[in-house]
Amino acid sequence: MAKKRISIMVVDDNDMMRTILRGVLRGEEYEVVGEARNGTIAVEMADRLKPDIICLDVIMPEKNGLEALCEIKAARPETEVVMITSNADPETVQEAIQNGASGFIIKPYNAARILNTLEKICERIRQRLA
């Protein structure tokens, strides 16, 4: 039986970073179902698209990733959210984990690290669905 493709939404205010992440996920067991450039759009899209996983940048205009994380988890607690940041200071990491983040990916992206992080999360999703 084939594995269910995991739906992912990519959120980053930097077009190039979204393109890189989308490229890393291409050809894998993931389907990028949406992209957003800020937290405000991300919250709206998450509610509409209902992705399994959201890769969410921390530092963005309008609504930052931590604010968006809180709103997304309040509306859809089953959605796994991986925070993306270039500066994983302990306070940010702690706040994100307390608010339901499933993991962290540090910029610049490393394809192996991204895929390893997402695979661990996918296993949790599959166990929950089994």
Annotate each predicted stretch with a short phrase.
Residues 38-41, 64-67:
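Acidic catalytic/metal-coordinating carboxylates
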Residues 15-34:
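Two-component/phosphorelay signaling modules centered on CheY-like receiver
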Residues 91, 109-119:
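C-terminal output helix
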Residues 87-88:
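Short, conserved "switch-loop" micro-motifs in signal-transduction and mechanochemical regulators
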Residues 60:
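Receiver (REC) domain active-site loop signature in two-component systems and cognate sites
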